[in-house]
């Protein structure tokens, strides 16, 4: 095997370990915050997309209180979040093509499409009610030292437990279909031909992404950097298959810890860079510590388990050609838009009356940072203790029959 083929197999075809990738994402998210002044987030922009769609039908969403809160000016090409998300899609698609992992894949049951849509709507609704998803109210929210992100994280884990219980209900179980004849496998030659084609397409996507970044750099340095960071984020989540759903779901089903450890360590790494940026004058993003964070987290946890993927999960899987996650993404946009429609009723009761609690202001910069690290360390311990439930030897349900020696 040539050196190039060995490199390709190791880094472009094989999936990467999620733990170092999540730490890298934490470092990158802190740099992104320092350079752009905003955090790595996606659902707010998806909700803006829903607002643009509503405007096509004669509505005036720019006058709604929710869109006045998060902003609806311009187009996705003019906004930092919009450019970054386009970069994420391009980065994920590029890496998936280089791995030869792009193909149109339909779910085995149409029921899964409906489940993905409903789960996506529930997750999108919960995320925007809490002002963030597994990124802005979790992975990049906790490093902002916003107390609401802690409430959202624990509520999401609890919601994932509810989602697991719901997913195991009989009417949601997908029946196993066994065909009468074996499906034909593609030949080695056709697989090699497909890999070469996708590798070339990956280079074309990379060239397109570079042109897009250069175009945005002409407008502003921040937009160009947003595109480059989006490419990095998208590439990392596709190569390491980063999905927070599996981390939360595994706590209740298998006890696997690698993804959860990676998320917690990634947040710890992000805390250092984010803290430095805040001390240098970049304003943190702090949101209300109200029932909206808890209710939104529970709904988000339920939704991502039902849908089978969180925001990062459905984004990279949709670029791999998995149709189910196209539907999940549409559901996310619908769910976030529903929050915007009903925000006057929801926000005035669940969010706006409550304080925005910044740990750095409440406890002081040093103590706030130490408290955050202590909380993350405690979470690492809880994850490990939870995993021990699945490795502890189980007692037999009944005692084995005692063998008696025959009487001589």
Model-derived regions: residue spans:
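Membrane-interfacial helix-loop segments of redox and metal-homeostasis proteins
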Residues: 1-408
